[in-house]
UniProtKB/Swiss-Prot annotation:
InterPro entries cross-referenced by the UniProt entry: AB_hydrolase_1, AB_hydrolase_fold, HAT_MetX-like
Pathway noted in the entry: Amino-acid biosynthesis; L-methionine biosynthesis via de novo pathway; O-succinyl-L-homoserine from L-homoserine: step 1/1
Function: Transfers a succinyl group from succinyl-CoA to L-homoserine, forming succinyl-L-homoserine.
Protein's recorded name: Homoserine O-succinyltransferase
Gene3D superfamilies, per the entry: 1.10.1740.110, alpha/beta hydrolase
GO cellular component: cytoplasm
Source organism of this protein record: Methylibium petroleiphilum (strain ATCC BAA-1232 / LMG 22953 / PM1)
The keyword Acyltransferase is assigned to this record: yes
Gene that encodes it: metXS
Listed GO biological process terms: homoserine metabolic process; methionine biosynthetic process
Major subcellular location class: cytoplasm
Catalytic activity: L-homoserine + succinyl-CoA = O-succinyl-L-homoserine + CoA
Length: 387
């Protein structure tokens, strides 16, 4: 199946300040986004893709002159793929607080003329959804055919259905949860402590010192990556394999293949990801809990949602286990909402939502075909455009 081909990011400077859930306000906010496919004449075939922790607006396609720049969900999105860009107009947007072009900690604070650093305000899933809604306003899209996201992206999809119930017809929530467990919050805290205790962090204002807290970022990524993989995948890929036939009997040297792999992942991550962004996004994960304002009752929290739902989980995902997805399904059933649920037997752990798995992709293909058949008007509209 074909790719969407060469893509070019676009940007939108919001025409008014963005109020945040914390009470702070982003006076000057720019969003970077990409679009794929054609918006039809009735503007009814738009699908918003919400990204997870370390992803971005670059969901599909590749950049000119960069052969290894495929979007993070390129296996899912494109002509003839499960999310078919011959039928849908797909939007990927980088959230505020991230580090891939939208306003974030490395951006210049207009009040000081210096990077925000640690002074960038805390952002939440709800803030991101509000920013995404502003982007849709600028694109002239009143209602989404669907919103889809995996992991943290799935939380944004859920939030869309309660914050803007009339603006989304379908929500596809993949490998997600209605909130973080204590264990997941604990993993995030260990990762954050690794960053803030790095001597190069400088209280979040490391930009002025010309350094990057790479040691902390490496450890944070290593901790996170462990939670993305299943025990079975680790066993099959690495087992107890050593780098060398003979043991070095050292506490400092790398002995096992899994150690080498984790260090490689940490090194790669520290070269491109912003430390302050990591703190912000993991805290947004911690804070997400739509039931909090309803005495912990998720059914009440989702009572205002009118969208139809597809909820997908994976058997070996222990970060956001199938039980957590079934909590979402139960809450929707309690409200007599239209919900489909698929539990995919896949070995990959939490990262399964990013993988090319025939059963998983067939579920999404069938669901998007349903959306297209019931609501998408004939093609022949206008291409995505910058505003």
């Amino acid at each position: 199946m074909a790719s969407v081909g060469i893509v070019t990011p676009q940007s939108l400077r919001l025409n008014a300040p963005l109020p945040l859930r914390s009470g702070a306000v982003l006076d000057d906010c720019t969003l970077v986004y990409e679009t794929y496919g054609t918006l039809n004449a009735t503007r009814s075939n738009a699908v918003l893709v919400c990204h997870a922790l370390n992803a971005s607006h670059h969901v599909a396609g590749r950049y000119e002159g960069q052969d290894k720049s495929e979007g993070w969900w390129d296996n899912l999105i494109g002509p003839g793929k499960p999310l078919d860009t011959d039928r849908f107009f797909v939007i990927g947007v980088n959230n505020p607080g991230s580090c891939f072009g939208s306003t974030g900690p490395a951006s210049t604070d207009p009040k000081t003329g210096r990077p925000y650093g640690a002074d960038f305000p805390v952002v939440t899933v709800e803030d991101w959804v509000d920013a995404q809604a502003r982007l849709l306003d600028a694109l002239g899209i009143e209602q989404l055919a669907a919103v889809i996201g995996g992991s943290l992206g799935g939380m944004q999809a859920m939030s869309w259905t309660v914050r803007y119930p009339q603006r989304v017809r379908h929500a596809i929530v993949v490998a997600s949860a209605p909130n973080l467990s204590a264990q997941n919050i604990a993993f995030n805290e260990v990762a954050r402590r690794a960053i803030v205790t790095d001597p190069d962090f400088h209280g979040g204002h490391f930009y002025a010192h010309g350094v990057v807290p790479k040691r902390g970022l490496r450890v944070a990524r290593m901790v996170g990556h462990i939670t993305y993989l299943s025990d079975d995948v680790m066993a099959s890929k690495f087992g107890r394999q050593t780098l060398n036939p003979e043991l070095a009997y050292s506490t400092q040297d790398i002995e096992f293949q899994i150690e080498s792999y984790l260090r490689y992942q940490g090194d790669k991550f520290s070269d491109y990801f912003d430390a302050n962004t990591y703190l912000l996004i993991t805290r947004a994960l911690d804070y997400f809990d739509p039931a909090r304002e309803f005495d912990g009752d998720l059914s009440r929290a989702l009572a205002g949602a009118t969208a139809k739902f597809l909820v997908v989980s994976f058997t070996t995902d222990w970060r956001f286990s199938p039980e957590r997805s079934r909590e979402i399904v139960k809450a929707l059933v309690d409200n007599r909402r239209d919900v489909s649920y698929a539990e995919i037997d896949a070995p990959h752990g939490h990262d399964a939502f990013l993988m090319t798995d025939a059963r998983y992709h067939n579920v999404l293909r069938a669901y998007f075909a349903r959306i297209a058949d019931e609501a998408v008007a004939p093609a022949g509209g206008i291409k995505g455009f910058a505003v």
